[in-house]
């Protein structure tokens, strides 16, 4: 009985006792915090960046042999191409393709004068798909273009949209009319020069009549 009363009093006193949160107070440092923020030296940062980039380039080029490095510098310095560039084992692939194209074109720039229409391009691709044994030289001879132009046509997979196709067809119509007008002028000049019967005014009149007829019937 006495023990039960004592335990009840102990529980009651523990419940009624208020909870006190004791926090440990830490003294602040006597040092003052720096209020001024110092900007970094941008000049030194740029110099460090340039030095790093230069160092990386040197490391990249250091993978080449001494003879290959000299040959690569000579190739980059001018349009001349070394005869032994194929023997360079460390030459990048894009360089090999570039030199092979220059060698194939015999130093001339890639600028084909003759343009093929979109229908002709699609016809060449269709023939190549149906008859894979046909070579680029065969198509070049048939369509009177360079073999490199045929290779580029067969390699490309670009297809125009409906709007782009309409614009291409419109350009080809204008190009055809202009080409026909030039042919007519050349034929007129040749005829007048051979016969010598028409005067300058008559020649201009005939040219204008042919041009009007082409514009009406285009």
UniProtKB/Swiss-Prot annotation:
The keyword Transit peptide applies. GO terms for cellular component: mitochondrion; nucleus. InterPro entries: NGRN/Rrg9. The keyword Acetylation does not apply. Coiled coil: none annotated. Residues 1-28 form a transit peptide. Pfam families: Neugrin. Required for respiratory activity and maintenance and expression of the mitochondrial genome. This is Required for respiratory growth protein 9, mitochondrial. It comes from Komagataella phaffii (strain GS115 / ATCC 20864).
């Amino acid at each position: 009985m006495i023990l039960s009363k004592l335990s009840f009093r102990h529980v009651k006193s523990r419940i009624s006792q208020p909870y006190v949160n004791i926090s440990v107070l830490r003294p602040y440092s006597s040092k003052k915090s720096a209020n001024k923020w110092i900007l970094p030296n941008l000049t030194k940062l740029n110099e460090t960046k340039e030095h790093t980039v230069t160092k990386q380039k040197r490391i990249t080029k250091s993978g080449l042999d001494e003879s290959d490095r000299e040959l690569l510098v000579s190739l980059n310095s001018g349009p001349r191409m070394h005869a032994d560039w194929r023997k360079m084992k460390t030459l990048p692939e894009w360089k090999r393709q570039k030199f092979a194209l220059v060698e194939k074109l015999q130093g001339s720039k890639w600028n084909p004068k003759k343009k093929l229409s979109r229908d002709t391009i699609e016809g060449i691709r269709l023939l190549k798909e149906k008859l894979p044994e046909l070579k680029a030289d065969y198509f070049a001879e048939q369509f009177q273009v360079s073999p490199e132009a045929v290779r580029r046509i067969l390699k490309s997979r670009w297809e125009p949209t409906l709007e782009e196709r309409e614009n291409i067809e419109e350009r080809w119509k204008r190009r055809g009319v202009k080409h026909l007008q030039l042919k007519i002028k050349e034929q007129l000049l040749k005829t007048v020069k051979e016969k010598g019967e028409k005067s300058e005014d008559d020649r201009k009149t005939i040219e204008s009549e042919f041009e009007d007829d082409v514009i009406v019937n285009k």
